[in-house]
Every structure is written in structure tokens, then in C-alpha cells.
A protein has these predicted regions:
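Internal alpha-helical scaffold of NAD(P)-dependent oxidoreductase catalytic cores
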Residues: 116-123, 129, 141-192, 199-222
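Short, hinge-like loop/turn segments at secondary-structure boundaries
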Residues: 44-48, 104-105, 140-144, 192-195
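NAD(P)+-binding Rossmann beta1-loop-alpha1 motif at the extreme N-terminus of oxidoreductases
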Residues: 1-40, 44
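Glycine-rich nucleotide phosphate-binding loop and flanking beta-alpha elements
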Residues: 13, 71-74, 93, 130, ...
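Rossmann-like NAD(P)-binding element
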Residues: 46-98
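Rossmann-fold NAD(P)-binding glycine/threonine-rich loop
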Residues: 90-133, 137-141
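Residues that mark the start of a beta-strand
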Residues: 2-3, 85, 149
Length: 222
């Protein structure tokens, strides 16, 4: 894997792109407003980055990070994402996305609905439970004593392996949550959402070891 595509280049998307470039990856960024609006981000990221449309970013990426509001997930380019590992950073916020009965009733998860739309893409839920400032600040080299872990969920074991390697390269350990049906354990309002990484008003964050993240995931109640 050498190229990471980005559909959505807001706080989380841009932060992951910076970490990826620092780790030696090429990145192709996109947003809903067009490549020309990303000139500043591309300049900041440097020569390893270029801007494109969402479909082009999906086509170019060996893996693709999706970081758009949940309500926009049906606009994702399923054809270009077919068969690819997709990193889903999204959360369902009813006040922003409107109410979805299946999610309000707890009969499915936002990740499962996104997987349903994407078909053969291999979706991994990740990056949705950490503030972007903490994500930028807490990256550490492999083996660091204060390395932080992030939870991941997927129905595809090979996709988990791919994402684990990517997270390791950009500075994070991984805690496997289980299939997408268990991704509710890392959604807003659960113990692992935000809290292990420190208060939002502390931009440096607090390192959260794998054991602590695993315990927070296990403590979730639906």
C-alpha cells in the first residue's frame, strides 16, 4: 500500500492525511466542494499530496478513508470503492443527520448501513472515537511506552490486518472490537468515545494504552 485516498478532508480526514504523509504515504484528497478548494491543504501536505474528485480519490487509493457526515453516505462512489478497504470515520448524530429508525432502535449500526450501500467494499470502522487534535498529538513510534490504541471493527479479517498495519505506520496500536454489528461499542455516548484520550480542551491529549481502550470497549452497554 502506497496511496491513501480521502473522501472528506475536514478535521479528521486532514489529520489522518498529515499522519499518512509523515509516514511516507502518497495521499489523494477530495471533498464535496471540488479539488480547487483543497489547494491550501495540498500545499500544506506537500509533494506527496494531490487533490481530486471523490470518485478519483476512491479510484486512486489502495485504501480509502471516508470522513463525511453519515447523512451523505449514500453519495459515496460505491463503484470506485468496490473491493477496496474503506476506513469509515463517520458517526451518526441525529441532530445533524436526521433520525434513522433502525439506528434509533438499535437494530443495526451506522457502519452496517454504510457497508450495505458500498456492497463489496471492505469497511473498517476506525478514527470515529477520537478528537482530531488528540489524533494529531498522540501518534507515537512503534514500541513507545506511551503509545495509544484505537478501536477497529470490521466483518473482514484481511481488512483488519491492512488497517492495523496502516495504524502502526502512522503511530497507533489497534484494539479489535469484532464485526460491524459490534461497532455500537465505539459510537458516541460509549465509554471509549473520546474519554480515554483526555478532555477536549487539552490539545495534547492523554495516551490510552491498548488495555485501557479494550476495557472501555468492554464496558459499553446498549
Amino acid at each position: 500500500m502506497t496511496t491513501v485516498g480521502f473522501i472528506g478532508s475536514g478535521n479528521i480526514g486532514a489529520t489522518v492525511a498529515r499522519l499518512a504523509v509523515a509516514a511516507g504515504y502518497d495521499v489523494v484528497v477530495s471533498n464535496s466542494r471540488g479539488p480547487e478548494t483543497l489547494a491550501g491543504l495540498v500545499a500544506d501536505l506537500g509533494p506527496a499530496a494531490r487533490a481530486a474528485t471523490a470518485a478519483e480519490a476512491a479510484e486512486a487509493g489502495d485504501v480509502v478513508v471516508v470522513s463525511v457526515p453519515f447523512k451523505a453516505h449514500r453519495d459515496l462512489p460505491a463503484e470506485q470503492l468496490a473491493g477496496k478497504v474503506v476506513l469509515d470515520t463517520n458517526n451518526y448524530y441525529p441532530q445533524r443527520d436526521g433520525h434513522v429508525a433502525e439506528l434509533d432502535q438499535g437494530t443495526t449500526t451506522s457502519a452496517e448501513l454504510e457497508q450495505r450501500h458500498l456492497g463489496t467494499a471492505r469497511l473498517v470502522k476506525v478514527f470515529n472515537n477520537i478528537h482530531f487534535r488528540h489524533l494529531a498529538a498522540l501518534a507515537r513510534p512503534a514500541g513507545a511506552a506511551d503509545r495509544t490504541a484505537l478501536p477497529v471493527a470490521s466483518d473482514d479479517a484481511e481488512a483488519i490486518t491492512t488497517v492495523t498495519a496502516f495504524l502502526d505506520a502512522i503511530g497507533y496500536d489497534t484494539v479489535e472490537v469484532g464485526p460491524l454489528s459490534e461497532s455500537w461499542r465505539i459510537e458516541p455516548g460509549t465509554p471509549v468515545y473520546g474519554a480515554p484520550y483526555g478532555p477536549f480542551d487539552n490539545p495534547d491529549g492523554t495516551p490510552a494504552a491498548a488495555a485501557d481502550v479494550r476495557a472501555a470497549v468492554a464496558a459499553a452497554r446498549r
